Amino acid sequence: MERVNETVVREVIFLGFSSLARLQQLLFVIFLLLYLFTLGTNAIIISTIVLDRALHIPMYFFLAILSCSEICYTFIIVPKMLVDLLSQKKTISFLGCAIQMFSFLFLGCSHSFLLAVMGYDRYIAICNPLRYSVLMGHGVCMGLVAAACACGFTVAQIITSLVFHLPFYSSNQLHHFFCDIAPVLKLASHHNHFSQIVIFMLCTLVLAIPLLLILVSYVHILSAILQFPSTLGRCKAFSTCVSHLIIVTVHYGCASFIYLRPQSNYSSSQDALISVSYTIITPLFNPMIYSLRNKEFKSALCKIVRRTISLL
């Protein structure tokens, strides 16, 4: 059947906050402050870990990588969103949309696999403490991070390629503030069955597999902790895992809510506001949860602050 009066989509128009036109300046101020706070907080965490040699161990190495990924993650989306909030023309080229989706997926998927790596690190620290420095040497840590990034890159490349090989001849108005999977699929012609396949792939590869690895790690961790002779030892061992468990719960909870819930339950504006939780708020709080609960990190930060003040 021939297409009539259909043109290929060359650019995408963002309509994420179009129903909140009167609040866009306020949203700009709020999101800008959150973005700057996210950058500042994560930069402080990275700097503290780099400057204090006592923190040059695998757990803090992975925390620094996590903070770095959070900075990149927000940089992919937030600056463009801030510009659009103050602009009349809220557009992105079709190629730019594809690049944004790939970058977002790459960092998000890598983040999921990195959380699995951090779970494995906790497993080695608690279940094999005497061999921890050998099993989690610098080369091993670098290899695990590289593997997490490789998995993220592969998943992002496959999904982005599949999505943008679809025919885009319909509307170019995207009811979102960045090129996320579900909103972009709605622009594609004949996407219904394909969208289900893509979302299933995303959930299986990025949510189920890393989460399963984390659960396996914590089954072994819990088994080892229960064998500790003293209650104090059990509490101390488990306290090192609490921050990681909180981040895992927040990350997978947000991702599951966004990608597994029925799409028809919320309006486009509600979808956009919900997405803010994992594009701005989560990257702000994740590293803070990990660092502020940790006495070693707080001690190192205070030491660096005192040293800096003494030099002024």
Curated annotation (Swiss-Prot):
Matching Gene3D superfamilies: Rhodopsin 7-helix transmembrane proteins (1.20.1070.10)
An example Gene Ontology CC term for this record: plasma membrane
Segments crossing the lipid bilayer: 26-46, 55-75, 100-120, 140-160, 198-217, 238-258, 272-292
Membrane topology note: Multi-pass membrane protein
Keyword Magnesium recorded: no
Biological process according to GO: detection of chemical stimulus involved in sensory perception of smell
Residue intervals annotated with topology Extracellular: 1-25, 76-99, 161-197, 259-271
Cellular compartment(s): Cell membrane
Residues on Cytoplasmic side: 47-54, 121-139, 218-237, 293-312
Keywords: Cell membrane, G-protein coupled receptor, Glycoprotein, Membrane, Olfaction, Receptor, Sensory transduction, Transducer, Transmembrane, Transmembrane helix
Gene Ontology molecular function terms on file: G protein-coupled receptor activity; odorant binding; olfactory receptor activity
Residues bearing carbohydrate: N5, N265
Family as reported in the entry's similarity comment: Belongs to the G-protein coupled receptor 1 family.
Protein task: Odorant receptor.
Name recorded for this polypeptide: Olfactory receptor 10K2
Encoding gene (name): OR10K2
